[in-house]
Each structure stands twice: as C-alpha cells, then as structure tokens.
Amino acid sequence: YLWLATLCSNGFGGILADDMGLGKTLQVIVFLYAHYIVQGENNRNTLIVCPASLVYNWAQECQHFAPELPICTVAGTAAERRELLDSLPDHPGQILITSYDLLRRDIEQYQNLTFDYQIIDEAQFIKNATTKAAQAVKQINSRFRLALTGTPVENRLGELWSIFDYLMPGYLFSYSRFREELELPIIQQQDEDALHRIQKMIAPFILRRLKKDVLKDLPEKLEKNMYAKMTGEQQELYQAHVQRLQMLLSKQSPEEFDHSRIQILSELTKLRQLCCDPALLYEKYTSGSAKLDLCLELIHNAMESGHKMLVFSQFTTMLDRIAERLQKEHIPYFMLTGATTKQERIRLVTEFNQDETPVFLISLKAGGTGLNLTAADIVIHFDPWWNTAVQNQATDRVHRIGQTNRVLVYKLIAQNSIEENIVKLQEQKAELAEQILGGDNIGTPFFSREELLELLQ
C-alpha cells in the first residue's frame, strides 16, 4: 500500500508485478478503500479495465472485501452503457469496471471524462502497442495509472515499453529510440550496459514479489514432466507431417520464409494437435492417443487418493475429447471455455470449490487467469504452450493464497516430438523476463528458419 500511495502522491505510475496468486486484486481494493472510505474522497472517479471474463470477478471481490466501495460495472447494451457514462459528471465518486473490448467500443463516451485512478488488470493485454485495446487505455484522461500483471515481459522488450507508454508516456522514450538504444543492443548484442540502464530506469516503478519470498507457509509446488510415447498410426501421421514441413522450410529462401510465417505457424499447430490426438485433425481417426491414455490414468490415480484437479489445454476440441472419455468412464467434471458466459464461470468456480466434482477441464486462454480454484491440488497441462509464463499463470489458479495442500503439476509431453523442443524454448523465453526484472544473463526469445528446423528434430 505504501508503494502505491507514494507513486500516486508523487504523480508517477507503476506496475504491480507480484507473482501470480499473491493478491494483486486485493491490494488494489485496499488502496481504493483507503482513499474512498478512510480518507473520504467520495467525489473521486476510478476506472478499472480488465479482460471481459474478469469483470464480474472484480465486482465480486470488491463486494466481498469492501462492500462500502461504490462499484459499478459498465455492461449491458450500448445504449445502457452510454447512459451510465453520460451520467458520471453529475454523479462523481464512482468506481467503474469495464472490459478492454467494451472500453474500445465506448471510447468516444470516455473522451470527456476524467478519472483520478485508472487501473488495468492483466496488463499483458496491451503488450502490443498497436492494438486498439492498448490505444484505448492510453486515451483515457487519468491522474494516477496502475498496471497489474504477473508477466510484464513475456516475449520481447517492446511489451514492457507499451505498458510504460500507458503509465508514463515518454518515460522510456519513443519506441523507435527505445528499440535502437535498449531493445536491440540487449537482444542482438548482449549489451550489459543497456541491460543495467533499463533495469535502473524501471526499478522504482515496478513492485515484484515472489511467492517464495512472501508466503513462507505456502505449500510446496512439485512439477513433473510426464512423457507419452506415440506409437502406430499416431506416430506415422506425426512423422509424415514433420517431413512435409522440413521439406517446405529447407527449400525456402529467406524472403519466402518471411512471407510464409502464417502458413508455418499453421503447420506447427497441426503438429501439436497430432501430439495431443490425431482425431483433432482427422475425423475418421480411431487408433487412440498416447497422451489421452496417460491423462486418464493420472485422473484415475488422483481420484483414488481423493484429489481434485484442473486439466488445461489450448485446444477446446481436445477438452471435448477428454470430456468424452470422462463420460464413458462415468467421471463427473466441469468444463470452462471461451464460450462460457461470465455468470456461468462464477457458478462453475463456486460449485467446484464446494462440491465433490473431481475434474475441471479448462481452456488455457479462457481460464488461465483470474480464477481461484484452491479446492484442487493437482494441475495437468495436457499440452505445452510456447511461453511458460502462460502455463504458470494457469497453475497459480491452484497454487495461491488459500491453498493448504501440496500442489502437484503434471506436464504431459509427447516423447521425441516438437513438444520436447517447445519445453526447451520455454526455458529460453523465461530468461528474458528474469534478465529485465533482476536477472543476469541475456538470451533471445526469437527464432529463425534454422531454429524452426531445430524444433522439428
């Protein structure tokens, strides 16, 4: 709280980058409670912007911890939202909660409004400075700006620049100057002076505490890679796709490679789907999936020991396949995807934390952030994602304040496949965030045609 109050009183913005599960939402609620209730600033306006899936979660958390706060969700039809925003000048002292998407749509209504406090949650949503979401949050007139994210840097330094461009425009220069003086020297030349310079510039405005330093009594988290060996038709289909992609890459010139990145990404996605279950690509495929069998084995073993678990996948079609197996084996489960409504999300989370349902199937994109599911103590990542920070965020739906059991994390990996190389790539990308936020050595998060060929080895 003192850090937030100091920044606010001195006219600076900041990034609250605490490790996932350390209560960033609650810290903001305490900050607002101190200003609105304790200090009686009942004419101040606040805007909280978050992913659409978290709007009602924010409102619920505020109601739970500080019911006195004047919370108002900006939702409903365009006409209803316009009426609410138009009335704000005559009724100050509101804490508005809206989504990035609705802010973008309603940006004209916000042009004549001024906010004392502007908070963006899951600030990685604005890591690309050219997106409409990033442009929208930067257009708001606000006195104090705060960004919440457990991952200020996921892939490249330009993401950090975009967040600071929202917090304090110009502090990290224009992007072209930032890229020339800091980003390129660090990434391409391993320039230690540039690294120390950016660390020194951002340090006062980033508060990052790790669970191991703050929560001494948080139960341990054990991670284990579980390997599944593809056999028979699954292995044959996978190898055929690998050979086709290797041939495509080896024949391309650098210019052709640059112009076919979307096609290559599509082919890589197909390889990842084949590792999961060839039925995701071939409707008539019936020969089974090594990873699906392994996943069901883990689920059965966990249930026999009385555990509840989350199963994450990037592919909702894979979750459907797992659900089919669970139904056949009469195992109760919940499922949450991008198609799940906000109200239904809250209901599913509440019921899972209270009842005996052992399995919660969750798409990584839809449920990897903003959920509290400490009733579970086992996490299964069915397929690895390019960036380990995304999977860590998902794991921390379980490994967070309120967890009383040791947490087991199983990462399912198809043996001798692209998935093994994705895991290696995850480790490299994790280096970038560690360097900027206090680490030592410099690595590169990018890959060339040659590195893509290595992924296929």
What are these regions (language model features)?
Residues Y1-D191, R197-Q457:
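ASCE P-loop NTPase motor core, strongest for the SF2 helicase catalytic module
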